[in-house]
Amino acid sequence: MKYELTATEARVIGCLLEKQVTTPEQYPLSVHGVVTACNQKTNREPVMNLTEQAVQEQLDNLVKRHFLRTVSGFGNRVTKYEQRFCNSEFGDLKLSAAEVALVTTLLLRGAQTPGELRSRASRMYEFSDMAEVESTLERLASREDGPYVIRLAREPGKRESRYMHLFCGDVDELSLQTSVPDSASGDLQSRVEALESEVAELKQRLDSLLAHLGE
């Protein structure tokens, strides 16, 4: 697969995919916007603390690889970035809205169960039921130009198998073992995280609006 990303590159692309859908009025993103999105404490696993210089290096590299492109509007001296990772005019990777939501959530959070993915991806796409989540994951796992996700072996004591994206290469399942219980408490945690993400984005929108009114 030609999509061989580092963990930081996956975070940058995941953030741009997320913000393109959830906060379209702030998209494309400036370097500062990408830094803020990458270092979010909600809906991110692991939480990162990237510097602007480190993010700029990742952006420059991704532009060279044609996964991103720069956008400069008339009269706007700030360079902004938009993703060309999928669904771009000349790109090869075409994903449905449901597939984009799942891929984005996997890029931002790593291996997750279908239940966790349904809850955490809900701001990008509203799945009708668990069957739709699972069928979308299976399509991503069986695509001729893929596979793009893999179903991991179910861990002892867990009800659901987790899925992981393959955009960073082969998966070492042992390194993905977690102590998070796949139970009602895990579902509750997912719902709390989704609410925290919504609050964080509303605060970001309010700050942006107040800054605009103060200009």
From Swiss-Prot:
Superkingdom of origin: Bacteria
Pfam short name (any one): DUF480
Coiled coil ranges: none
Family recorded in the similarity comment: Belongs to the UPF0502 family.
Xref: NCBIfam families: PRK11239.1
PANTHER family: UPF0502 PROTEIN YCEH
Protein name: UPF0502 protein YceH
Gene behind this protein: yceH
